Amino acid sequence: QYVLFESERDKGTNVTAMYDYLMDSYENFMKVVEAPDNSQYIGGAKNRLRALYPYLLNGAVYYSEQKQPSKALDFAAAYIDMPQLKLFRSELLPKDNRYASVVYYAAVAAFNLEKNEKALRYFQEYLNTGTEAQQKDCYVYMNMIYQKQKKYADQERVLEQAIAKYPVSLDF
């Protein structure tokens, strides 16, 4: 699949097929990484994952522009989650300057698709980036999710954080 992805990428004629091959490659290499007794294949899988990593962001942007939030979320999630894998903890995968925007998009897309645990994880990741632009909205969304889940202790914690950061806001 990876070779097919590279072929389509180099031709540049069928973008949808290219990203389909990219996601297939990602999923297959992740199966290798997660498989038991994978030591003889792990190096190759890691190299391929490292090579396809920047294209995951491009896939997220592409499907976002195509108004396909579920597919965009798949690519964004892969882009966000891959550097957190144990396999890559000893190295820094380069994060694009759009990283925070992609994390926020993924969080909102997950929220809209009612994938609340994923949404919470990505809203928290956005807060961890230190980017100010959408922080207030992250707290609002997290509050709504915890309220919907009836997790009142978590909701109270988020509201306390939000009020400490935005003491004069009427949103909390």
Where are the predicted features?
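Single-residue signature of alpha-solenoid repeat helices
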Residues: 18, 22-25, 72, 119, ...
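Helix-capping and short linker residues that terminate individual alpha-solenoid repeat units
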Residues: 34-37, 84-87, 91, 131-132, ...
